Amino acid sequence: AEQGYSDAQSNLGLMYEEGKGVVQDYVEALKWYRLAAAQGQAQAQYNLGLMYDQGKGVGQDDVEALKWFRLAATQGLPHAQYNLGLMYDQGKGVMQNYAEAVEWFRLAAAQRQPLAQYNLGLMYEKGKGVRQDYAEAAKWYKFAAMQGHVPAQYNLGLIYDHGKGVAQDFASAAKWYRLAAVEGQASAQYKLGLMYDEGKGVAQDFSEAVKWYRLAAAQGIAPAQSNLGLMFGRG
């Protein structure tokens, strides 16, 4: 790193940031990231952007974060492309621009970045920066869901449940709700409970319904609490 190798500088920065083999030191991490980033090392540019984004070792600065995310993103780094998309989506450090957000999400999603795939699905579902298209939303949710992205699994369950952009399919809805529910997603737990309660996509099973309602209710999902009350009320 002392000899100017950008990959070594970037790795040393990460060691200081995470406190691996050295005492954790954000200022020292920044120093090495800067040296590597100035040589065009994409990962260091991205990590430097994160430091500014999170205010680690430096004052929080959206404009600087955006600058470094952009430099890494234009080199094709998917995490940087996703974060740049997020900045445009939220109007952080730049004028809010949904169409621009979509383009960066799309580039990262094409590289199988699950957060970008999920966010691209959201943009299509809501019609933000693109024409509303439930079939496209379902496509991108599925890519993210298959990589274990929990909110995408839940949203995909909803899409199958309501038949938005896909043929209505309660069994598929239950499958995706279950994957999200097992990971603790409260709304998915409630929906899965409902499927068991009503026998939609699964064999009707009141004890399973109670199990999932309980889990959702414990996380504050009001309909799960009221359905649980109704089930106990009817014995």
Where are these regions (language model features)?
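Long tandem-repeat architectures and their stereotyped inter-repeat linkers in very large proteins
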Residues: 31, 35-38, 42, 67, ...
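N-terminal segments that cap or nucleate solenoid repeat domains
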Residues: 1-15
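Short helix-capping/linker turns of helical repeat alpha-solenoids
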Residues: 3-5, 18-20, 25, 38-41, ...
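Hydrophobic face of amphipathic alpha-helices that form TPR/SEL1-like repeat modules
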Residues: 11-18, 47-54, 83-90, 119-126, ...
